[in-house]
C-alpha cells in the first residue's frame, strides 16, 4: 500500500514526457517516501477505529487494563535498572552490594531448597599452630560405631587368628545381623593385612642387574636374563663354521694320504656348512677344485703302480697275501658315500650341479678301472 502512489507517479511521468523525464523523476519520488507513508497510514487507522464497535471496546477494557498494569510495572523496573546501570557505568560504586542486589530484579519462580545442616564440631587441637610447645598432637581417632561389648574387640587380631593360624574356636561368634556385620569387618581387616604384606615384599625386592650390552630400558627381569643368555651363547653359523674347520682339515689330510678314497668326503654337519657365510662357500669351491686336480694326478700314478705290480713275480704276490683286496672294498664303499654326498651338495647348490655330476662320473670310471685291475690280480693268483 505504501509504494502504490509513488509507482503511479513514476508511470504517469513516463507516459507523458518520455524516458528522460522518468529517469529524472525516479530519485525525486524515492526522496519523499516518508510523506507518502504518513498520507496512506492516517486514513487506514481512521477506518479501523470506525469499524470497531463500542461493545467490543467495553469487553476488551478490563483485560487491557490488567495487561497494561503488569507491562507498566515491568517497564518501570527495566527503566529504573537501565538508569542505575547508565549512572554507574563510568563511576565505580564504593558499596559492597553486587549488581543483582542494587538493581531491582523480579523474583524468580524457583525457590532455593531449605538445607537443615548440623553444625560442624571443630576440635581446637587440630588448629594449634605450635604443637611442640604444649601437649603433643594426638592421632586422629574415629568414633566407636559398634555397641559397647563389641567395640573393645581387636578386629585385626581376630582376622589373623581366623586366616593365618586357623583358630576358629578362639574367635567369638555373634548371631544376627550384627554378627554378619562383624564378620565382614574381619574380612576387610584380613585384606588390609595382605595388601600391606604385598607392598612390603615389592619394595624389598632388589632389581637384578642388566647385561652390559643391553639398554637400561628393560623393565622385566625375565627379559634381561634371556638376552644375557643369548649374548653368552655363540651364533649357530659361527658354531657350524668353527666345527667344520677342523673336520675339513682332517678330510684334507685323508685326501693327501688316500686321494681316490676320500675324493668327495664331506664334513659331518653339511647343514651347518651350507648355512655358513659366503666366504665359507667360496673356500669350499676352491678346495673342490684342488681336490679334482689331485685326484687326476693320483689316478695316473696309481694305474702305473697297478701295472707294475701285475707284471711282478708270483712269489711276491703270494707273500703279500691280500694284495690290497680290502682296500678295494673300502674304495667301493667310500665312492658310494661320496656319490651320496655329491648328490646332497648338488641339491643344496643348483649352480654347482654340473660340477658335481662331472665329479660323480669321474669316480664311477675310477671304480671300474679298479675293479678290472682286481680281476686281473685274481686271475694271476689262480695261475
Swiss-Prot record:
Spans annotated as Disordered: 1-70, 89-115, 200-222, 232-251, 284-325, 338-383
One Pfam family in the UniProt entry: FAM217
Skewed-composition ranges (Basic and acidic residues): 44-56
Compositional bias segments (type: Polar residues): 8-43, 374-383
Stretches assigned to coiled coil: none
Outcome, altering residue 95 to G: In a breast cancer sample; somatic mutation
GO CC list: cytosol; nucleoplasm
Family, per entry: Belongs to the FAM217 family.
Protein name: Protein FAM217B
Source species of the chain: Homo sapiens (Human)
Amino acid at each position: 500500500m505504501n509504494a502504490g502512489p509513488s509507482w503511479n507517479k513514476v508511470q504517469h511521468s513516463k507516459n507523458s514526457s518520455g524516458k528522460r523525464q522518468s529517469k529524472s523523476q525516479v530519485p525525486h519520488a524515492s526522496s519523499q517516501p516518508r510523506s507518502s507513508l504518513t498520507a496512506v497510514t492516517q486514513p487506514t487507522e481512521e477506518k479501523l477505529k470506525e469499524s470497531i464497535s463500542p461493545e467490543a471496546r467495553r469487553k476488551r477494557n478490563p483485560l487491557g487494563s490488567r495487561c497494561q498494569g503488569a507491562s507498566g510495572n515491568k517497564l518501570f523496573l527495566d527503566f529504573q535498572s537501565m538508569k542505575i546501570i547508565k549512572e554507574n557505568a563510568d563511576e565505580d560504586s564504593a558499596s559492597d552490594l553486587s549488581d543483582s542486589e542494587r538493581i531491582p530484579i523480579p523474583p524468580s519462580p524457583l525457590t532455593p531448597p531449605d538445607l537443615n545442616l548440623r553444625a560442624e564440631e571443630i576440635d581446637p587441637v587440630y588448629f594449634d599452630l605450635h604443637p611442640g610447645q604444649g601437649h603433643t598432637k594426638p592421632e586422629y581417632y574415629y568414633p566407636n560405631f559398634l555397641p559397647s561389648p563389641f567395640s573393645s574387640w581387636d578386629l585385626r587380631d581376630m582376622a589373623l587368628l581366623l586366616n593365618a593360624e586357623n583358630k576358629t574356636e578362639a574367635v567369638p561368634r555373634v548371631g544376627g545381623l550384627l554378627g554378619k556385620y562383624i564378620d565382614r569387618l574381619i574380612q576387610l581387616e584380613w585384606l588390609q593385612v595382605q595388601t600391606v604384606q604385598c607392598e612390603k615384599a615389592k619394595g624389598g625386592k632388589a632389581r637384578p642387574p642388566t647385561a652390559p650390552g643391553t639398554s637400561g630400558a628393560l623393565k622385566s627381569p625375565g627379559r634381561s636374563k634371556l638376552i644375557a643368555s643369548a649374548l653368552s651363547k655363540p651364533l649357530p653359523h659361527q658354531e657350524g663354521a668353527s666345527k667344520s674347520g677342523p673336520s675339513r682339515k682332517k678330510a684334507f689330510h685323508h685326501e693327501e694320504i688316500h686321494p681316490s678314497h676320500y675324493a668327495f668326503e664331506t664334513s659331518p654337519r653339511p647343514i651347518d656348512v651350507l648355512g655358513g657365510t659366503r666366504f665359507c662357500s667360496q673356500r669350499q669351491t676352491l678346495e673342490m677344485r684342488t681336490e679334482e686336480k689331485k685326484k687326476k694326478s693320483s689316478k695316473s700314478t696309481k694305474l702305473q703302480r697297478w701295472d707294475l705290480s701285475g707284471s711282478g713275480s708270483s712269489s711276491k704276490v703270494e707273500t703279500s697275501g691280500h694284495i690290497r683286496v680290502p682296500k678295494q672294498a673300502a674304495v667301493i664303499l667310500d665312492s658310494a658315500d661320496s656319490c651320496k654326498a655329491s648328490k646332497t651338495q648338488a641339491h643344496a647348490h643348483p649352480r654347482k650341479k654340473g660340477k658335481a655330476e662331472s665329479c660323480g662320473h669321474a669316480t664311477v670310471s675310477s671304480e671300474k678301472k679298479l675293479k678290472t685291475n682286481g680281476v686281473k690280480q685274481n686271475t694271476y693268483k689262480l695261475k
